[in-house]
C-alpha cells in the first residue's frame, strides 16, 4: 500500500513538472518559454525575421504574432519588426475594418513594449525610454 502511494505521488510530481516545463514565456516571465514552447518561439523568430528581410510582411505576420503573444520578453525585435510588419499591412490593406484591426494591434505593440520595457532594456546596449516609445506611438497614430 505504501509503495502504491509513493508511485502515485511520484506520478503526480512528474505531471506537475511537465506542466512547468511546457509554459510559454508570457506565463512565467521567461524570454522564450520552456521545453517545446521555447523551440517553437525560436523557430517563429527565425521564420518571421527572414520574411521581414525580404519584405514579405504578409507571411511574417503569423509567426511574429505568436512570438508577440507568447513570449513578450523574447527580444526587442519583436516590437521593432512588429511595428514594421503592421505598418506595411495597414498600407497594403484595402478593407477598412482590417486596417483598423491592424492599427489597433500596432498601438498595442507600443503599449506592450512599454509594459515590458525594463526586461527588454536588459537585452540591449542602447536601452529605449518610455518617451522614445511614446513618440513612436504618436508618430504612428498621426501618420496612419
Regions found by a protein language model. Name each.
Residues 35-49, 72-92, 119-144:
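Amphipathic alpha-helical repeat scaffolds of TPR domains
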Residues 29-32, 37-50, 61-62, 66, ...:
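Mature soluble domains of exported/periplasmic/lumenal proteins and thiol-rich metal-chelating peptides
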Residues 58-77:
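Internal amphipathic alpha-helical repeat/solenoid segments
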Residues 23-24, 52-64, 98-115, 144:
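Helix-turn-helix repeat elements of alpha-solenoid scaffolds
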Residues 1-31, 83:
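Bacterial Sec-dependent N-terminal signal peptides
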Residues 32-34, 52, 68-69, 110, ...:
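A conserved position within tetratricopeptide repeats
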Residues 3-5, 113, 137:
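Basic side chains
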Amino acid at each position: 500500500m505504501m509503495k502504491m502511494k509513493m508511485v502515485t505521488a511520484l506520478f503526480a510530481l512528474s505531471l506537475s513538472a511537465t506542466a512547468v516545463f511546457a509554459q510559454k514565456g508570457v506565463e512565467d516571465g521567461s524570454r522564450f518559454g520552456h521545453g517545446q514552447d521555447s523551440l517553437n518561439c525560436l523557430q517563429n523568430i527565425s521564420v518571421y525575421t527572414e520574411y521581414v528581410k525580404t519584405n514579405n510582411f504578409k507571411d511574417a505576420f503569423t509567426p511574429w504574432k505568436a512570438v508577440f503573444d507568447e513570449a513578450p520578453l523574447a527580444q526587442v525585435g519583436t516590437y521593432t519588426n512588429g511595428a514594421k510588419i503592421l505598418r506595411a499591412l495597414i498600407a497594403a490593406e484595402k478593407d477598412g475594418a482590417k486596417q483598423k484591426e491592424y492599427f489597433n494591434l500596432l498601438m498595442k505593440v507600443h503599449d506592450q513594449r512599454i509594459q515590458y520595457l525594463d526586461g527588454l532594456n536588459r537585452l540591449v546596449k542602447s536601452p529605449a525610454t518610455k518617451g522614445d516609445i511614446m513618440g513612436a506611438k504618436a508618430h504612428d497614430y498621426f501618420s496612419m
